[in-house]
Amino acid sequence: MKVIHTIKDLQAELSVLKAQGKKVGLVPTMGALHAGHASLVKRSVNENEVTVVSVFVNPTQFNDKNDLVKYPRTLDADCKLLEACGATYAFAPSVEEMYPEPDTRQFSYAPLDTVMEGAFRPGHFNGVCQIVSKLFEAVKPHRAYFGEKDFQQLAIIREMVRQMQFDLEIVGCPIVREEDGLALSSRNARLSAEERENALKISQTLFKSRTFAATHTVSETLKFVEDAIAAVPGLRLEYFEIVDGNTLQKVDNWNQTSYVVGCITVFCGDVRLIDNIKYKES
């Protein structure tokens, strides 16, 4: 595996491989890689002859500068993991490389980006779209891989690809969890042992809510989850919404649509964790 730091060098490598008819997969990451990222990389390696993994902590998607400073940066460990997964290139640019001048582009995909994360993290998805569109333009991959843990992000990126007419396939990949059910996240490394124990209640509550939902209404299921999280000291619910998996708009009853997802964000201490669960999938 080669580690590349500039767009020019990456494009020089890829142009040769694309000329040979090789398919290129892109896995955009912010580093601090774990088994969830590894599953995306392995899938790309399985489906494409060339896999590029970007490792870049994107400053424009952090609405909380403190979160940006605290975000773990572990490039050496990341490269070892990527090599073990069979990646062809790790693309680790500087901020100056990706943003030679400030990116003033405004992306708006209402109503997808105005709810949930969009409401609580203003500017976040604009920053995501800025960097992902830059990566798509730099790499011009045949496929790009994103995890379903960031469910709203995946929906917005699909819409961006549709509107900007990028010629590539977006591949959503299932959430990877610890053996006990906690959704893998780079932010989990910031949890104390006690916080880690509390955080487990998030996924446990979601799994229980799926059983509960089979015999209860949407509003009863919302209350079930809200009450369960409120009962755990050290957890603070930011939001839990039950939405149409395509439009991300709230649903009032289970029969409203064939694709229903519950999306949750919880503060565990000062660490913000997200997760989701599918109640119905067509």
Curated annotation (Swiss-Prot):
Q: Which pathway is this protein engaged in?
A: Cofactor biosynthesis; (R)-pantothenate biosynthesis; (R)-pantothenate from (R)-pantoate and beta-alanine: step 1/1
Taxonomic source organism = Bacteroides fragilis (strain ATCC 25285 / DSM 2151 / CCUG 4856 / JCM 11019 / LMG 10263 / NCTC 9343 / Onslow / VPI 2553 / EN-2)
Q: Which NCBIfam families match?
A: panC (TIGR00018)
Question: How does this protein assemble?
Answer: Homodimer.
Its GO CC terms are:
cytosol
Sequence positions that bind beta-alanine: 61
Other facts noted in the record for this chain: The reaction proceeds by a bi uni uni bi ping pong mechanism.
Q: Name one Pfam family in it.
A: Pantoate_ligase
Its protein name is Pantothenate synthetase
A GO term for molecular function: ATP binding
Function in brief: Catalyzes the condensation of pantoate with beta-alanine in an ATP-dependent reaction via a pantoyl-adenylate intermediate.
